[in-house]
Amino acid sequence: MKHIDFYLDFISPYAYLAFEALPRALPGLSHEVTYRPILFAGLLKHHGQLGPAEIGPKRDWTYRHVLWQGREHGIAFDMPAAHPFNPLALLRLAWASARQGTPNRYVCETIFRHVWQGGAPADDVARLEALTAQLAPARDPASDAVKHDLRAATDAALAADVFGVPTFAVDGRVFWGLDALPLLRAQLEGDTRVDEVWACAASVAQGVRR
């Protein structure tokens, strides 16, 4: 059985779409998934980048694209009332609700759908209180231990060469994005073409640096 680490942030529409699409992408393959919520902003800061929603034209394109992708994949999808938003409360809630080391699929699904279905504000205080009551976290989301878990997960993601969300890590390789799901499936199937493209990337000489 193959083990997949799924790095995600609830702020990302692509992470939500990939979360919903993953079971449909891997039927018939023996695998297990560990869900690892991380702070996408931490990755961006580490690499000196702006988020997609922080660049005006890219923001507009992203929202159009994810709405289209949702319809193409048959996934219920609504933009929240405002985006981007601060996802820390949701990320900490996920880790606080983890009863066996990492959050399970139900926890992540519940939080993702809180954000990406219905079109309501993701960070509305009353909605967050209701979400917390629904998940009944075993730990206080505001506790130092929970904050540590989120920081540790983000640091571990960086150490694993994760640079964005959604990212799937398996067999020491990282697969980034919703559109990487077919390549991820090929890796799990043992398709030798994946080895070929991996080797090709390493053979390209570093060109101009800015």
Feature-to-residue mapping (PLM):
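Short amphipathic alpha-helical segments at helix-loop
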Residues: 7, 47-51, 138
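Structural alpha/beta surface segment adjacent to cysteine/selenocysteine redox centers
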Residues: 16-115, 198-210
